[in-house]
């Protein structure tokens, strides 16, 4: 198969990210999907990067933001609240996502497969400063999203890691909206 055909096939699979719903309800009552989340995270990276005091590879920041949730096109989204309620779910998530990323990236030409897998693993294992920054921004984007709940309902965050803190922040911001 030609390289371009492999890339087109990969893009078809990537399309599935657009239909993976997250548990976040947007202000209009619809659910956020993974593609929306990745889009907003990528913008957050672009907006925050110029203000970082630590020297970073800006391109890598964006690449990490783009690849960090693509395995969910096969596994779906595992919510933080569900993982908190069921600790074994986190290991199940990691295992399924590793299988999914292997399957998804196998479609690509070797060099692209190798590059995207390296980025994905780097993010998952927080191996670099860039991966750690994107991970923090990923959580920040979710916190910002909490303020967009329909009717300002931010109770979801009470059940997440550091949820009480997120909940307090979200309630304070809700008062400003």
Segments (PLM) and residue ranges:
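Alpha-helical, largely C-terminal catalytic domains
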Residues: 1-177
């Amino acid at each position: 198969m030609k390289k371009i055909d492999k890339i087109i096939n990969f893009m078809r699979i990537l399309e599935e990210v657009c239909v993976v719903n997250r548990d976040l309800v947007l202000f209009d009552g619809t659910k956020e999907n993974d593609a929306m989340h990745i889009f907003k995270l990528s913008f957050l990276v672009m907006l925050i990067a110029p203000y970082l005091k630590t020297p970073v590879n800006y391109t890598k920041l964006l690449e990490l933001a783009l690849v960090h949730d693509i395995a969910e096109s096969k596994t779906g989204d595992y919510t933080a609240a569900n993982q908190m309620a069921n600790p074994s779910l986190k290991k199940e998530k990691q295992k399924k996502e590793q299988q999914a990323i292997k399957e998804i990236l196998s479609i690509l030409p070797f060099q692209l497969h190798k590059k995207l897998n390296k980025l994905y693993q780097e993010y998952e294992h927080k191996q670099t400063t860039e991966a750690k920054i994107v991970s923090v921004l990923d959580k920040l984007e979710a916190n910002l999203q909490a303020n967009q709940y329909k009717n300002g309902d931010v109770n979801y965050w009470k059940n997440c890691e550091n949820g009480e803190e997120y909940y307090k922040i979200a309630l304070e911001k809700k008062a400003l909206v």
